[in-house]
Swiss-Prot record:
Domain notes: Consists of 3 domains; the N-terminus binds the ribosome, the middle domain has PPIase activity, while the C-terminus has intrinsic chaperone activity on its own.
Gene3D superfamilies from the UniProt entry: 3.10.50.40, Trigger factor ribosome-binding domain, Trigger factor, C-terminal domain
Catalytic reactions on record: [protein]-peptidylproline (omega=180) = [protein]-peptidylproline (omega=0)
A Pfam family this chain is assigned to: FKBP_C
Family statement: Belongs to the FKBP-type PPIase family. Tig subfamily.
Role according to the record: Involved in protein export. Acts as a chaperone by maintaining the newly synthesized protein in an open conformation. Functions as a peptidyl-prolyl cis-trans isomerase.
Subcellular location: Cytoplasm
Protein name per UniProt: Trigger factor
Species name: Geobacillus thermodenitrificans (strain NG80-2)
Record-level GO BP terms: 'de novo' cotranslational protein folding; cell division; chaperone-mediated protein folding; protein transport; protein unfolding
Lineage: Bacteria, Bacillati, Bacillota, Bacilli, Bacillales
Principal place of residence: cytoplasm
The entry's keywords: Cell cycle, Cell division, Chaperone, Cytoplasm, Isomerase, Rotamase
Length: 428
């Protein structure tokens, strides 16, 4: 097999690959064995048609696509290795020659990982954030806990107020016609949560249980359902019930409900302070680590291919969907409630995706420049920590993980960031 790599403008290039005729014939043989299983001719059972009759009846060309499916993946992988390139996109394959008894010649146009020209990455100056925990911080955390333990109590009298939960029926109309997803019964809506279209919740304020009302709103221009985007709508709403939050008293009993390890409210406050101090310390350390990476990446010269940003955006979108599912939602519901669509969300994520790609490429280049690598011992230590945190044996964890490349890569990036922090100046 012969391989030629031609660099084009930017980060693109073309591999020209020639696979010898002997390998092509092996590919055709394998393709025939696969295809003939479903072929029958007069006098021959399915799968028993001789090769010579098959080619006479259908032509050897009938085997080409299956042969290519067999030959191309291995040939492309070997060509990439031989050329010493790192593709970041799927190849655009162009078959130049495919004939029985001749070599296979194909071109593969790909985008490759860009060259990184490192700038300053040692001696970076970063600021450490204040880790002081104030009494106000403790009180704010206590108030949030109080909110979490609040009970919803039906308001026998009074009207809907901000922060209340209204149990409603609603049906929406655009141009006098109902639309899909615009109707629900006994829906619990927290007023002020921003769950519904802008203006909807505000117009419920002041309503009483049993009251009906027509609400006028306009769908956002970027609303995910194009047929509704930017259009005025009328919602018929009926309030069945109004519930208000009833906060528990901040006393020793509340403290014991929140944390069974404490006996008094003062003990709970002390524990909250300790946790906040630990959280702020971790936050400060993470901020320093992020800052040195961001500065090193900003100092590097990199022509980032659009496909790498797109791939990272895809990954971020999957991560976001997974987080939503853990909260009992999904992307479609998010689009419905937020008024966004996938294109708008992708655009919103694009800047962060590019920063992530730039940071990863920079860290990779620094690790190479400083000969930072990971030993088997370090990998085993990391696996032991992970196994302990999941209450698993190391062998079981390895079985679940399978390929350990991801673990090694994470460790390598962590060591590289450690290096940057050690060689930076952190101002208090």
């Amino acid at each position: 097999m012969s391989v030629k790599w031609e660099k084009l403008e930017g980060n693109e290039g073309v591999l020209t690959v020639e696979v010898d005729a002997e390998q092509v014939n092996k590919g055709l043989d394998a393709a025939f064995k696969k295809v003939v299983k479903n072929v029958s001719l007069p006098g021959f059972r399915k799968g028993k048609v001789p090769r010579v009759l098959f080619e006479k009846r259908f032509g050897v060309e009938a085997l080409y696509q299956d042969a290519l499916d067999i030959l191309l993946p291995e040939a492309y992988a070997k060509a990439v290795e031989e050329a010493g390139i790192e593709p970041v996109s799927m190849p655009e394959i162009d078959i130049e020659q495919m004939e029985k008894g001749k070599s296979l010649i194909f071109k593969a146009k790909v985008t490759v990982k860009p060259e990184v020209k490192l700038g300053q990455y040692k001696g970076l100056e970063v600021e450490k954030i204040d880790t002081t925990v104030t009494d106000e911080d403790v009180e704010n955390k206590l108030k949030r806990l109080q909110e979490n333990y609040a009970e919803l109590v039906v308001k026998e009298e009074g009207t809907v107020e901000n922060g209340d939960t209204a149990v409603i029926d609603f049906e929406g109309f655009v141009d006098g016609e109902p639309f899909e997803g615009g109707k629900a019964e006994n829906y619990s809506l927290e007023i002020g949560s921003g769950t519904f279209i802008p203006g909807f919740e505000d117009q419920l304020v002041g309503m009483k249980a049993g009251e009906e009302k027509e609400i006028q709103v306009t769908f956002p221009e970027e609303y995910h359902a194009e047929q509704l985007a930017g259009k005025p709508a009328t919602f018929k709403v009926k309030v069945h019930e109004v519930k208000a939050k009833q906060l528990p008293a901040l006393d020793d009993e509340f403290a014991k409900d929140v944390d069974e390890e404490v006996e008094t409210l003062d003990e709970l406050k002390s524990k909250i302070r300790t946790r906040l101090e630990e959280a702020k310390k971790n936050e400060a350390e993470a901020a320093v680590r992020n800052a040195v990476v961001e500065k090193a990446a900003a100092n590097a010269e990199i022509d980032i291919p659009a496909v790498m940003v797109q791939n990272e955006t895809d990954r971020m979108l999957r991560e976001f969907d997974q987080r939503l599912q853990m909260q009992g939602m999904n992307l479609q519901l998010y689009y419905q409630f937020s008024g966004q669509d996938e294109a708008a969300l992708r655009e919103q994520m694009k800047e962060d995706a590019e920063k992530r790609v730039r940071a990863a490429l920079t860290l990779e280049a620094i690790a190479k420049a400083e000969n930072i690598d990971v030993t088997d011992e370090e990998v085993n230590e990391e696996l032991e920590k992970m196994a302990a945190s999941y209450n698993l044996s190391v062998d079981k964890l390895k079985e679940l993980i399978g390929n350990l490349d991801g673990v090694k890569e994470d460790l390598k990036w962590r060591k590289t960031v450690d290096f940057l922090v050690e060689h930076s100046t952190v101002a208090a």
